[in-house]
Amino acid sequence: LAEAEQLLHLLRGRAPSFVSGEDICRQLNVSRQAVWKQVRSLRGQGYGVEGRPRQGYRLLSVPDRLYPAEIHAGLGTVTLGSRIVYLERTGSTSDVARDLARQGAPEGTLVVAEEQSAGRGRRGRTWSCPFGRGLLFSLILRPPVPPACAPQATMLAAVAVARALEKAAGCSPGIKWPNDLLLEGKKVCGILTELDAETERVNHLVMGVGLNVNQVAEDLEPGKATSLRLHGGKATGRV
């Protein structure tokens, strides 16, 4: 882990209590000057880190960003998300994931982005998402199944996203098979699975997911799409 991420992990584990500078230096094996640089780095990324003389530092808040450290903090999987590629802006997370897969990226590699300008849907449709308002990611899978079974992955993903939304956001989306999730008849999430396969084996599968989280009405196609914010009437944390 990078030094700033190690400090974040330590502060998160002790929050909301303070951690003394001496304790930080000892546990991370760094100087006080290095600790201060790490604190500044975290603050620059949007973390609320309070420092007090003779008390040390404590973590007060975390930014609504898809930082790997934030995803890993709540991740309960071993393979999925074992490697996370974070992008502020990209055309398509699936394009990035596809290139990484062809280069041999391991199964479970996750590509996330804050903003996407050329996301893909079915039948070649494209769509975009403003910075910091959606949950945009693509996952590399290498399932040991014949290509004919690969489409089942999209259905499994749709069910998984629906269950996650029920648990995290308290809403119950309907599934428009095979790859859309709807709230009140409007699209809130799209899933696109792209396959690279030979006759009898799957080389890799890229599963792209685009979830509308904090978009406002002006960000979306009228009458056809919605977001968790529009549905619930309040902003929703993305991590």
Question: Which residues fall in each region the model found?
Answer:
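Nucleotide and nucleotide-moiety/phosphate-recognizing core
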Residues: Q103, G108, S128-R238
